[in-house]
């Protein structure tokens, strides 16, 4: 990536400048929030390393870095449910990415749901936290897709 190092840039250059200076964490990752470009709904939160960010910029497809598998992956490479990036943004200090996508097949979550955020935190009768399914319909069977 041809971006300048964030540590060498003045805060004003990072916050107001026009040069891409992503600020990766100690593990070389940056948080990426992915939303549906039409509805604005949050589909998922994932991580990108420098290579994933560059591949996303270059290809127009969403690429991420899997922390659990320690590898780069293109969204949809297993399921076929590719995310086409319509817009990318960085936050004010360039340590988080927001991408607006067209979600192929309608489902972004590996559980088969449209969004990874399919449980709302409520409280039970005693006041203890309770997860309540919302928008939890499965659009595909993960056991059949991820063999």
UniProtKB/Swiss-Prot annotation:
MF terms (GO), sorted A to Z: magnesium ion binding; phosphoribosyl-AMP cyclohydrolase activity; zinc ion binding
Cofactor note: Binds 1 Mg(2+) ion per subunit.
Keywords attached to this entry: Amino-acid biosynthesis, Cytoplasm, Histidine biosynthesis, Hydrolase, Magnesium, Metal-binding, Zinc
GO biological process: L-histidine biosynthetic process
InterPro entries tied to this protein: PRA-CH (IPR026660), PRib_AMP_CycHydrolase_dom (IPR002496), PRib_AMP_CycHydrolase_sf (IPR038019)
Cofactor(s) it depends on: Mg(2+); Zn(2+)
Residues given in the record as Zn(2+) binding sites: 92, 109, 116
Subunit structure of this chain's protein: Homodimer.
Designated name of the protein: Phosphoribosyl-AMP cyclohydrolase
Source lineage: Bacteria, Pseudomonadati, Pseudomonadota, Alphaproteobacteria, Hyphomicrobiales
Gene name of the record: hisI
């Amino acid at each position: 990536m041809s971006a300048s190092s964030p540590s060498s840039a003045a805060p004003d250059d990072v916050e107001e400048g026009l040069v891409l200076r992503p600020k990766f964490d100690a593990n070389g990752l940056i948080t990426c929030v992915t939303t549906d470009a039409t509805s604005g709904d949050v589909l998922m939160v994932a991580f990108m390393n420098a290579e994933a960010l560059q591949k996303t910029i270059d290809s127009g497809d969403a690429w991420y870095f899997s922390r659990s598998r320690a590898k780069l992956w293109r969204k949809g490479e297993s399921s076929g449910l590719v995310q086409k990036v319509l817009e990318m943004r960085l936050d004010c200090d360039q340590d988080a990415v927001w991408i607006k996508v067209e979600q192929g097949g309608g489902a972004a979550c590996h559980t088969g749901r449209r969004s990874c955020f399919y449980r709302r935190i409520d409280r039970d009768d005693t006041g203890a936290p309770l997860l309540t399914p919302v928008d939890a319909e499965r659009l595909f069977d993960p056991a059949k897709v991820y063999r």
